[in-house]
């Protein structure tokens, strides 16, 4: 099956994250439209309708949809709306699908849909690589596959926003800071700067050190020399810009992975 083959049939991919949701219209492997909304607006079918109806108005030929979600309440509302609004297939990304990699996990039903889609995108978009896949958002996930496309394991940790929120909520006087506005230096000269820099450097340098260790594991234990580091998620461009190592950043990697899984399961 040539899953990369172009087609005239339009596909709606709904990527539901903890903070934001992306509605992406694909024709083949080309994204025609992207709309982002806050996930907390999608808790009801009416909320979904208000967000998605402009997309259907602009693309009346939409027939099929795939939903990739880490928020059950929003997923239920979106799927309910789509079943009543389109004539084609509505597919939900989960571990019951046919996957392009071997998933070794204690309980595959707990493996997040976003992680499934990201790993699928790695496997179906590239060949002859081992992969270290990062999704840097509200939480940060690391997933690792060898060049035989066997899932080796991963890590889940707080993202920048959660680290900032935790410092604020679990101390008496520390403010809630926005790390995206930090002026990068080594040391801060105010409480806000000290917090921003502490969060950013702790997260970035710690993450890069973990990646270095994973690369060594892949090289010496799995005998993989061609290793591709990829990243997606809202904070990926900022965080990876501070890396000393090369990293491929793809904003729509999870959406593309969901699209590829839809084709892979036809």
From Swiss-Prot:
Record's GO cellular component terms: cytoplasm
EC number(s) on file: 2.7.1.33
Major localization class: cytoplasm
Binding, substrate: 105, 112-115, 191
Positions annotated to bind K(+): 135
UniProt superkingdom: Bacteria
GO biological process: coenzyme A biosynthetic process
Cofactor: binding details: A monovalent cation. Ammonium or potassium.
GO MF annotation terms: ATP binding; metal ion binding; pantothenate kinase activity
Catalytic activity: (R)-pantothenate + ATP = (R)-4'-phosphopantothenate + ADP + H(+)
Subcellular localization, as worded in the UniProt entry: Cytoplasm
UniProt entry tagged with the keyword Kinase: yes
Active site location: 114 (proton acceptor)
Pathway assignment: Cofactor biosynthesis; coenzyme A biosynthesis; CoA from (R)-pantothenate: step 1/5
Top EC category: transferase
Chain residues that bind ATP: 15-22, 138
Cofactor requirements of the protein: NH4(+); K(+)
Pfam families xref list: Pan_kinase (PF03309)
Alphabetic keyword roster: ATP-binding, Coenzyme A biosynthesis, Cytoplasm, Kinase, Metal-binding, Nucleotide-binding, Potassium, Transferase
Entry-linked Gene3D superfamilies: 3.30.420.40
Assembly description: Homodimer.
Family from the record: Belongs to the type III pantothenate kinase family.
NCBIfam families attached to this UniProt entry: baf (TIGR00671), PRK13320.1-1 (NF009849)
Functional summary from the UniProt entry: Catalyzes the phosphorylation of pantothenate (Pan), the first step in CoA biosynthesis.
PANTHER family: TYPE III PANTOTHENATE KINASE (PTHR34265:SF1)
Protein name per Swiss-Prot or TrEMBL: Type III pantothenate kinase
Protein's organism: Chlorobium chlorochromatii (strain CaD3)
């Amino acid at each position: 099956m040539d899953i990369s083959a172009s087609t005239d049939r339009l596909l709606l991919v709904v990527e539901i994250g903890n903070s934001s949701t992306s509605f992406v219209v694909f024709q083949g492997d080309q994204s025609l439209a992207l709309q982002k909304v806050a996930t907390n607006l999608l808790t009801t079918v009416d909320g979904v309708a208000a967000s998605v109806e402009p997309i259907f108005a602009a693309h009346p030929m939409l027939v099929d949809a795939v939903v990739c979600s880490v928020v059950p309440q929003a997923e239920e509302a979106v799927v309910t709306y789509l079943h009543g609004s389109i004539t084609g297939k509505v597919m939900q990304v989960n571990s019951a699908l046919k996957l392009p990699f071997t998933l070794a996990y204690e309980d595959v039903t707990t493996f997040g849909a976003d992680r499934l889609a990201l790993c699928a995108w790695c496997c179906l978009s590239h060949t002859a690589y081992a992969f270290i896949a990062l999704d840097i958002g509200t939480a940060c996930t690391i997933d690792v596959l060898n060049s035989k496309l066997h899932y080796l394991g991963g890590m889940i940790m707080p993202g920048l926003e959660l680290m900032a929120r935790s410092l604020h909520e679990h101390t008496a006087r520390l403010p809630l800071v926005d790390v995206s506005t930090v002026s990068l230096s080594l040391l801060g000269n105010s409480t806000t700067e000290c917090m921003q820099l502490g969060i950013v450097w702790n997260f970035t340098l710690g993450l890069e050190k973990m990646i270095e260790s994973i690369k060594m594991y892949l090289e010496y234990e799995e005998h993989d020399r061609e290793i591709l580091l990829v990243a997606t998620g809202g904070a990926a461009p900022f965080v990876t810009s501070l890396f000393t190592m090369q990293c491929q950043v793809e904003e729509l990697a999870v959406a593309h992975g969901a699209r590829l899984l839809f084709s892979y399961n036809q």
